[in-house]
């Protein structure tokens, strides 16, 4: 037994001796469902929604009336003065109530807009974890292929058809693949923890994920473009935000005259037994302060919402979705072609070379380039798979929803 074989065995024995954690296979659908319930952004959006809904109540509150009473006794003619005072703004008459209703709808739309971002975040974390798992599996497969050649290499060395250097290099490559796989374990555990946090898992179970393939892309982007134009949650939220800002601006302009106080006056003359009634008012004259700050703030909010809405004009949305679709389709086709055509050719070449070597018709020097090219080809196929998943995620970001939802909607 060579020192390289001893190194390989000791590495695997050491890794097997480490404490193992319970693992659970989590489908993508379950991860998305749990994320919608427990994602930190969802919880924060729910809390923010409750705060905004409570704040709208303050807008509709009308100050309580104030009662002032004075008792005067001038010699033998006591007088009682009563003043009933009600603070008034023009916006109290229906306008604030209307703004509150629109603002409540805007707050709810903003909360719903968080859903698309949460789904994309969970999908990204899920894909990141799968990436590490797949890379570990790739390293394992490479190592197994190398070890499967070891007996043939050893026989060739004994038969004088190869040198010990090639055998040592084979052992070194196998050891490297094993070490690379173990080095990825830290990343796997870290990404499992990140996904667990996003979906609200509190146990110490390590999550194992499945390949997030999803549905195949449609033959054209027409249905996806229509879905994005009609369904984008962020666009709906911006529409409500612009409507709320417009109502707020109208309310601020209405209150340009400033607050007023309406008064009902009553005076009881106890000496003559008469009750004198009167009305009056006080108001701030809009000379220096014309509510410009509130008006400017409301107008800025409205302009900001309108500027953001321009990004979601149908023509722009359609163009972005079309580009994302073409990118995702190209990436997916490249990944499929490489995985189903190129990799099997190199695997077949290695198998043929191994069989020839077993029959004494080949040499170690012929196998080594094939092994290297197969390893490179598998890594390239893996990179193309990642690119395809990333392109799909970007497409779903442009859609404002999951691809499955868009395709299901187009069938109805």
Q: What are these model-derived regions, one by one?
A:
Residues 9, 20-21, 35:
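Cleavable N-terminal signal peptides
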Residues 21-29:
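Cleaved targeting-peptide boundary
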Residues 1-8:
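Bacterial N-terminal signal peptides that target proteins for export
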Residues 21, 380-412:
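Acidic, low-complexity, intrinsically disordered peripheral segments
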Residues 156-161, 356-361, 398:
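A short glycine-centered flexible hinge/capping loop motif at secondary-structure junctions
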Residues 30-92, 197, 201, 225-310, ...:
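A small-residue-enriched
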Residues 117-231, 324-331, 335, 373-374, ...:
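Periplasmic alpha-helical coiled-coil/stalk elements that build and connect Gram-negative outer-membrane
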